[in-house]
Structure formats: C-alpha cells, structure tokens
Amino acid sequence: MIKTIKADLKNKIQKTIKELALSSNIKLDKINIVMQKPPKSEMGDLSILIFEFSKILKLSIPVITQEIIKQIGNEYKTKSMGPYLNIKFNRKEYIQNTIKKVNKEKENYGANNSLQNKKTIIEFSSPNTNKPLHVGHLRNDIIGESLSRILKASGSKVTKINLINDRGTHICKSMLAYKKFGNNITPEIAQKKGDHLIGDFYVKYNEYASQNSEIAENEIQQLLCQWEQGDEKTVQLWTKLNKWAIDGIKETYNTTNITFDKIYLESEIFKIGREVVINGLKEGLCYKREDGAICINIPTEKNNIDNQNFKQKVLLRANGTSIYLTQDLGNIVARKNEFDFDEMIYVVGSEQIHHFKTLFYVADKLGVTNENNLIHLSYGMVNLPEGKMKSREGNIIDADNLIHDLSQSTMLELKKRYENEQNLQKLALNISLGAIHYYLLKTAIHKDILFNKTESLSFTGNSGPYIQYVGARINSILDKYNNLNLANKNTNFDLLVNENEWEIIKIISEFEEYIIKASKDRNPSIIANYSYLLAKNFSTYYQDTKIIDKDNLELTHARIDLAKAVLQTIKNCMHLLNIPYIQKM
C-alpha cells in the first residue's frame, strides 16, 4: 500500500518539477525526491523535502509547493511546513486496503519482485570437520538462512551452498590424537555425537602439541602427506572420523532448521583451481617465479592500475601444491558452470576480509568472473563474557550445548505455567531456537556480539521469545473470538479510528519496503527489528484496548481483522528470521 502511494506521489512530483524546469529553460539530469516520516504523527504520514527543488529551479518553496499540490489534487490532504510538504493519507481507504491485502495474500504478504530473475548463490556455514558447531557458527548459519529467505521473498532465485572443510591439517590433528589416545572408541561407546567426540581429540592434540611442539608438527605433516598419497590406513581413518563429524554437524542443522540446496566436500573439488592458474600462466595473466612458484601481482591500492605498488601472491607453490585461495578459485569456476549465477555471496567472518578482497581481484584478473559478482558478507565475532572463544582450548559455547542449556532453563519456566501440558520439551526447544536466532540477527551483522544467555531468553523486550509470545497472544485472542461463533458478513473498517490502530496499520503496510531494504542491504537485522516494532506496538494496543467487546460486535469484527493482519505479518517475519511460530505459550 505505502509503496504504491509513494510511487504515485513520485510520478506526480516528477511531472511537476519537469514542467517547472521546462518553463524556466533549466536542464535536469536527475530528480531526487526525498520522502520520509514526519517527526510527529500529527504532522502527517509522509514528508517531502522541497528545499532542493527550490535551489535547482531558482523558485521559492511556496511556489513549487503550490504547483505540486495542484498536481496531487484532492486524493491526499497536504500541508506546507517550512521546507517540507506534509501528506496525510485517506485513513479509511488505507486501513481497509492494507488489512484486506494482508489477509488475502497471507504467507505471501510482503513478497516482491525487486530481485526478479536474479540468480544468487549464498555459501554459508562451511564448518571444519574437527569440532562441533559453536555459537559463532550459529551466527553464520542464521545469517545465511535468513538472508536466503529474504532474497527469495524479493524474487531472487537463491541456491544455498555449504562447503565442508574436510581436508588439511585441522582434521589431521584430530586423526593424530585419535591414533595416539583413541583406543578405538566410537560415538556409540562414548555416548556422544560424532562431532563432539572429534572435537575432544582436537583439544587432546593441542594438549599433546603444547608439550611436544616440533614432534607433533612433523607427525602432522607426515600424516597429511600419507593422506595426499592415498595411504590406505590413513584414508580409512580420515573417512571414518570425517563421517562421524559430518553426521553430528548435520544433526545440529536438523535441530536448528538450517538447510542447503547443495553440500560440497573440499576433498572432492580442491584440485579444480590448479587448472585455472595453469591456464592463467599460459595466457600471461600470472607468472612463474625463479623457484617455480606461480604468482600474481596484487595492487596495494584498489585504484593502482599501473601496478607500481604491488605485493606478490603465490597461487601455486614451487612443489605444485595449491593454497586455499587457489582452491576457492576452482570453486567459483565449478559454481559458475553449474549455476551460472549473477552474484555469489560468501557469509564469512570479518577476519577473512583480506582473503576475499584478494580472491575477488584474482578471479577477475584470471577471467573467472567479474569481481563485482562476488560479495563477502562479513559479520562480527561472537564473544563470551569472559573473552574470545578458542576451540583448541575447549573454550567455546557448543551450539548443541547452548541449545540444551536454554531449553532446560525454558523448561523450568514452562513447568510453572503448564503443570500438565504435553510436549513441553518441543515447546522449550522452539522458544530456545527463537531466542538464539533472534539474538544473533537483531544486531547489524558487521558488529561483534557479546552473547548473553539470560538476555536472549527474556520474555520481555527486544527478544525472540517476546516476538513469539506476542504471536501466541494474538492467536489466543483469535481462538476466543472463533469460539464465540459471531456472524460477520462485512467488516466496517471505518470504526478503526484509534491512533494506536493507525500506527499499527502504517507499520504493517511498510513490511514490503522493509523486505526490499533488507534484501538490498543484505541485512536480516532490518527484519528482526521491524518484527519487534510491530509486536511492541500491538502489545501496547492490546493493553489499552478491549478487542473483543460483546456489546459492540461491529467494532469487535474490525479489530479482529486487524489482529489477524498483525499475526500474519509477525508469522511472515518469523519465517524470514527462521524463528518457530508458537500457537500457545
């Protein structure tokens, strides 16, 4: 609704400004129309800045304003205030159209075509197979999952990819510790998920290496060499431990409702990049150093086209082995061939900014793809109150343990409310997932997070459980209304004259714009904070207003339709944020 009104107003304003410019023989390259909310609701529903037009057209603000008002006509109420023209909507029509649109489109409300036909790949999670997922992975996962849903809601064809890092020294460290200290233990014997068991041996390796540094390093290199040469026993151990780890990680994905369209294993595709570099050498796009290593020059400044200040980047070592960047080049080629993407987004922590800047430059230079098609969506670190997490020291919040701890805390609270309630465990899990996902999404993704369990689980304030609770409360209101079996042929929306109702309607009507902005900025926190804004406004309205009034059924019907629209919009937000909707709390 609001999008349509803005488009209509922009067309009319543009027409007016063009006519005024033409009459004054002024050439216009572009007409920039600034629309914003007035600081106070009584001033209007939309403000248009006229001042810039006055400077360009050399006309007074009142003259320009009057011409715009003529063009707008009687469709909206208008009032000039200083450099602004304030617009008031036709409330009755606006309310009716908004509520009807939401309750008709239901789960599709908010969907738009701003990214129609755009093919997007999002690579996220990408865990190592030497440890379980921790809360940092959870932030990566929920950013990737939520952004995928937001981009889909804007019309993009999204493919979600997970590249599991199942080779290299990190898994060899767990393998070495298992060989030394494992005694053929299995996840079944240990009664542990496989990823947790492998993580234990990763910690054991670091304990061993701290006392035997040089020996441990030599043993790791020997083990890695044996794997690369295909030594049967080494490959068998590698296969077994990786399967345990990956099976455990997939269990966590299942719990958190994180899904992928395609899962790659690094061990299956890491050689592709070598061909890209060899071809680049043949075409003169990179060069061979005296020691045999193949290199490329990276400008130290983005705009340093002459390459007079550069640093040398090795793409293939002198012994022919590749580095991570070279493997990533191969991955881009494979995905371009398979999906022919328009853009590929990497959801990776901010500590990898330099790596991706280099990767994108090299991909462009070697003709793999235009670097503008590659995006590093970097996010801030997730820290504990006691400091940064270190998996090698065991100082991490495991994802599974965090979910379990929050579920247990929630269970204690739920048992106070529902002594005989069935399925409390499932309810507690869904509340905990809502708490975690919302807490990790509500902050702008580039910022670091200090994870606070208590705050994340709060049933009041800016939290996932609060959003879930408001949704459950509205559902309870609708159940109560339905049980009254009240006949309602035609809703009279003219009765919704409460200022709180008007504010809620305006928030609901802006949902599509929020999705478009979240898509454009690649920022799920926009949707998270929108959902809190809507939930908070409805909660205030509910406290001050009698929604079901048997003495005024006509008003009751109108307010129930409003409540339905609010609930549908909240549910749509929850879907975009991967927060479970709960009917009863």
Swiss-Prot record:
Catalysed conversion reaction: tRNA(Arg) + L-arginine + ATP = L-arginyl-tRNA(Arg) + AMP + diphosphate
Record-listed E.C. numbers: 6.1.1.19
Motif ('HIGH' region) on chain: 127-137
Lineage top rank: taxon: Bacteria
GO-annotated cellular components: cytoplasm
Quaternary data: Monomer.
Protein name: Arginine--tRNA ligase
Organism of origin: Borrelia duttonii (strain Ly)
